[in-house]
Structure formats: structure tokens, C-alpha cells
Amino acid sequence: MPLLKAKPTSAGRRHVVQVVNPDLHKGAPYAPLLEKNSKSGGRNNNGRITTRHIGGGHKQHYRVIDFKRNKDGIPAKVERLEYDPNRSANIALVLYADGERRYILAPKGMKAGDAIQSGSGAPIKSGNTLPMRNIPVGTVVHAIEMKPGKGAQIARSAGAYAQILARDGNYVTLRLRSGEMRKVLSDCRATIGEVGNAEHMLRSLGKAGATRWRGIRPTVRGVAMNPVDHPHGGGEGRTSGGRHPVTPWGVPTKGKKTRSNKRTDKLIVRRRNK
């Protein structure tokens, strides 16, 4: 997809770089697959901030995405590709032979009119979903389950993919984009190909306001705060913080391991690249 660099007609347009996809549907989304998407402003039920840097932003509907892809043996046709404000990837509206419509993540190269299907008997073709025990070693996949039947959790953002490296008993070994190699049950499903819209990372919003439209508030440096607000705060004049970098709660923020699920450590063959 081409990148469009805006003309510098104003300071806010000067640095804008947009991803242009002429194949995206220009009308309204499919209403039966929309849900209310309430904003929390990063607050919990007590009104306290539990996640910083969240607030404002344009109103959005949530598009219900089929991450399970469990309509086995029923062929489907891609009706159209759509923009989804809730994720970096584009989505595709597919019509199944029994009349049901669902949204799925749009893989690279998918276009309107393509035929897809799910199940262990589906051909090895981009957009088809199969249990990984039926996918050849070396195949690039996305939308990968971590538990059979739970729905895709790995490799769902724009341009994401993983590669099946080996099959060992009830497990397959995957290499993720991060460099991590991990085992996943071979009954877990994955979709062939990589997620589309890989150029998403090349875009430039151009101004702070465009980030605010997306519901993201500014991030203030700890050294610019007062001592009551952050361990790096305070001091006479400008300081470097006076200690190794930490979070507002005093946890080291560069290099400290924060993974705590030791039960599944055995499934990680190699940690991600640093």
C-alpha cells in the first residue's frame, strides 16, 4: 500500500504520513457486529487512575472479531475489507455459505472475492485457519491460539506473524517476531499468512492532537515532577533523577524481568532478543 506524505499547508500537516489503501470499504461498518465501546479514562470503579495516559478520544464502536474461526467445513467469501479503529490491522467482512457474516483479521494480500475456510481439512492457503498439527513446518502463520478453543492471542497486530519451526509430540515450536521461541499445543489453531497493513508502522501522525484523537494522553517525565509524584522528582534546578531509572512505584524500569508466570516458563524455549 502506498504512503501519502501530506503537503505542509500548516504546521500540523507538515509531518503527516498516511497509509492509503484504496481497497478499504468507504461506507458504514456491518451493524449487527458492532458493540458499544465505553471509555473509562483509565479509571476503575472507585474513580482512581489505574492506567495512566488514557482519556478523551473519538467515540468508537467495537467490531466483534471472530478470533476462534470455528465454522469448520463451511466455505466463506470475503465481501470487503474495512478499517478498524480499535486495532492496527485491517479487518475483513466474510460471508459464510450458511448466510452468517463475521469479521476476521485481514491477512496480507487478501482482497474482496477471496474464498477462505476453516478446519483440519482446509488447504494451506493465506487466510485459512487450521489446527497447527495440520500445518507444515516452516509455514508463516498469525492469529495463534495459546489454548485450544480459546481464540487467537498471538500475532494479531498489523504485520505480525510467527513461523512454525518444529513439531514434537503434542506441541509445535514457534518463532515469534520478537525472537522468542516457544511451544504451543498442536491442537491450537492458527491462520496461514501474516497480518496485513504492515506499513502501519511507517505512518506519522504529525501532531500531538492526532494522538489525543486516539484517546492517548501525554506522558510526563519523572524528572519533571515533584518528589511526591515520582522517585525521580524534585531537586534544585534540572537533575538527572539521581538514581537508576525506576517507575513511579519504584520498580527498576530498564532490564528488570517482570514475567511472573513460572508455570509456563517451561514452554519458552528461548527468550526474546534484547
Curated annotation (Swiss-Prot):
Q: Which SMART domains match?
A: Ribosomal_L2, Ribosomal_L2_C
GO biological process terms on file: cytoplasmic translation
Annotated GO MF terms: rRNA binding; structural constituent of ribosome; transferase activity
Q: Name one GO cellular component term.
A: large ribosomal subunit
Q: Which InterPro entries match?
A: NA-bd_OB-fold (IPR012340), Rib_uL2_dom2 (IPR014722), Ribosomal_uL2 (IPR002171), Ribosomal_uL2_bac/org-type (IPR005880), Ribosomal_uL2_C (IPR022669), Ribosomal_uL2_CS (IPR022671), Ribosomal_uL2_dom3 (IPR014726), Ribosomal_uL2_RNA-bd_dom (IPR022666)
Q: Which SUPFAM superfamilies match?
A: Nucleic acid-binding proteins, Translation proteins SH3-like domain
| Ranges annotated as biased composition (Low complexity) | 39-48
Query: What are the UniProt keywords, alphabetically?
Result: Ribonucleoprotein, Ribosomal protein, RNA-binding, rRNA-binding
Region: Disordered; residue ranges are 28-54, 223-265
Identify the Pfam families for this entry.
Answer: Ribosomal_L2, Ribosomal_L2_C
Keyword presence, Ribonucleoprotein: yes
The UniProt family comment states: Belongs to the universal ribosomal protein uL2 family.
HAMAP family in UniProt: Ribosomal_uL2_B (MF_01320_B)
User: Subunit details for this protein?
Assistant: Part of the 50S ribosomal subunit. Forms a bridge to the 30S subunit in the 70S ribosome.
Stated role: One of the primary rRNA binding proteins. Required for association of the 30S and 50S subunits to form the 70S ribosome, for tRNA binding and peptide bond formation. It has been suggested to have peptidyltransferase activity; this is somewhat controversial. Makes several contacts with the 16S rRNA in the 70S ribosome.
This protein's name: Large ribosomal subunit protein uL2
This chain's source organism reads Alteromonas mediterranea (strain DSM 17117 / CIP 110805 / LMG 28347 / Deep ecotype)
